[in-house]
């Protein structure tokens, strides 16, 4: 198959070879693939809202919201629908095309789930795409989310299956894969990514990308995060910054392996210089979280992003183009599995 074709049969060795090739060759290939499937001067923007903070039962070693970690994040009640409406309107006014709503849960509670469904409906009524990250889902919850009109569901794999037990013990890797399967089976777009800088090896990064690249349907979007060490978590000691070039290699490899997927710069952008971000965009990153907060983590201010986009000649993508790209990916993956 040619460079830029959608494949689901990637081997680990192929991906390691892509990631480890000379930097200029990697960047050229990634940009070539990117231009085959996307406008290289457009960025999709999402805003992330924390609809329920703290008190999560999971033991994710990086997370400030785990009840098992000794952080300063306090458990809060779930946000009211009206507050979500206000945040959605503000995000839309600033140019975001999607509102991602996150709750610190192992899985949604029966009591709170109806309010989540209402949030999906009201945000869609405002003309924004909707995304949720709520933890694991059962079949009935997936069905209800589909009926409510949910566009995307985020469920990150975080790292490779081999390294995963060093980061999380309360939920298995297979649990995460099963939730992704349920969401895809229901026809909801999947958003799933990972975190770089948790002590993993190069092979773990390659294996994570291979896992996504060999899924029956590639995720519609893959957020790539840089670890933000939080005091009170087991990874608070990980103070050595991941080399920017290593991070850019992950972005470029994800672009080549998943040609039609949105590759999103997520948490940790505060640690990247404008020049490093520009190289990420050149490597095929075409989505960011837009707004000064990502759950409990700081993010570049919207005004700074706008200035950077202006310097680079980048435009923020409009909803219709996002929908067209999602449809194209769905059609392509259907053909592959027919």
From Swiss-Prot:
Binding sites annotated in the UniProt record for [4Fe-4S] cluster: 56, 60, 63
Pfam families xrefs: BATS (PF06968), Radical_SAM (PF04055)
Top-level taxon of origin: Bacteria
Catalytic activity reported: (4R,5S)-dethiobiotin + (sulfur carrier)-SH + 2 reduced [2Fe-2S]-[ferredoxin] + 2 S-adenosyl-L-methionine = (sulfur carrier)-H + biotin + 2 5'-deoxyadenosine + 2 L-methionine + 2 oxidized [2Fe-2S]-[ferredoxin]
Gene Ontology molecular function: any one: 4 iron, 4 sulfur cluster binding
GO BP terms in the entry: biotin biosynthetic process
Cofactor or coenzyme needed: [4Fe-4S] cluster; [2Fe-2S] cluster
Keywords: 2Fe-2S, 4Fe-4S, Biotin biosynthesis, Iron, Iron-sulfur, Metal-binding, S-adenosyl-L-methionine, Transferase
Segments forming domain Radical SAM core: 41-269
Pathway: Cofactor biosynthesis; biotin biosynthesis; biotin from 7,8-diaminononanoate: step 2/2
EC number: 2.8.1.6
UniProt-listed SUPFAM superfamilies: Radical SAM enzymes
Residues holding [2Fe-2S] cluster: 100, 131, 191, 264
Cofactor binding mode and count: Binds 1 [4Fe-4S] cluster. The cluster is coordinated with 3 cysteines and an exchangeable S-adenosyl-L-methionine.
Stored InterPro entries: Aldolase_TIM, BATS_dom, Biotin_synth/BioAB, Biotin_synthase, Elp3/MiaA/NifB-like_rSAM, rSAM
Keyword DNA repair: no
Function statement: Catalyzes the conversion of dethiobiotin (DTB) to biotin by the insertion of a sulfur atom into dethiobiotin via a radical-based mechanism.
Family: Belongs to the radical SAM superfamily. Biotin synthase family.
NCBIfam families: bioB (TIGR00433)
Subunit structure: Homodimer.
UniProt-recorded name of the protein: Biotin synthase
Organism, scientific name: Hydrogenovibrio crunogenus (strain DSM 25203 / XCL-2)
């Amino acid at each position: 198959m040619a460079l830029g074709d959608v494949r689901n049969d990637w081997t680990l060795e192929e991906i390691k070879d892509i990631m480890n090739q000379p930097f200029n060759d990697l960047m050229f290939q990634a940009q070539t693939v990117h231009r085959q499937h996307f406008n290289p001067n457009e960025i999709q923007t999402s805003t992330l809202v924390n609809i329920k903070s703290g008190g999560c039962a999971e033991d994710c070693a990086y997370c400030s919201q785990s009840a098992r970690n000794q952080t300063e994040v306090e458990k809060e009640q779930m946000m009211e629908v009206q507050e979500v409406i206000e945040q959605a309107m503000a995000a839309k006014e600033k140019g975001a095309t999607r509102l991602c709503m996150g709750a610190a849960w192992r899985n949604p509670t029966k009591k709170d789930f109806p309010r989540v469904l209402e949030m999906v409906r009201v945000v869609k009524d405002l003309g924004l795409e909707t995304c949720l990250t709520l933890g694991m889902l059962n079949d009935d919850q997936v069905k209800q989310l589909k009926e409510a009109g949910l566009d995307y569901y985020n469920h990150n794999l975080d790292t490779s299956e081999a390294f995963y037990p060093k980061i999380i013990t309360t939920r298995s890797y297979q649990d995460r894969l099963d939730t992704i399967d349920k969401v895809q089976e229901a026809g909801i777009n999947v958003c799933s990514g990972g975190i770089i800088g948790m002590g993993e090896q190069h092979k773990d990064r390659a294996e994570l990308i291979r896992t996504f690249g060999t899924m029956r349907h590639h995720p519609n979007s893959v957020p790539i995060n840089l670890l933000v060490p939080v005091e009170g978590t087991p990874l608070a000691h990980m103070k050595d910054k991941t080399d920017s070039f290593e991070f850019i290699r992950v972005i470029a490899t994800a672009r080549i392996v998943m040609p039609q997927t949105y590759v999103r710069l997520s948490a940790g952008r505060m640690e990247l210089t404008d020049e490093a971000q520009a190289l990420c965009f050149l490597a095929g990153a075409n989505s960011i979280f837009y707004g000064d907060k990502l759950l409990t983590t700081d993010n570049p201010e919207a005004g700074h992003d706008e200035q950077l986009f202006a310097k680079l000649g980048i435009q923020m993508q409009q909803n219709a183009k996002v929908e067209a790209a999602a449809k194209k990916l769905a059609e392509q993956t259907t053909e592959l599995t027919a």
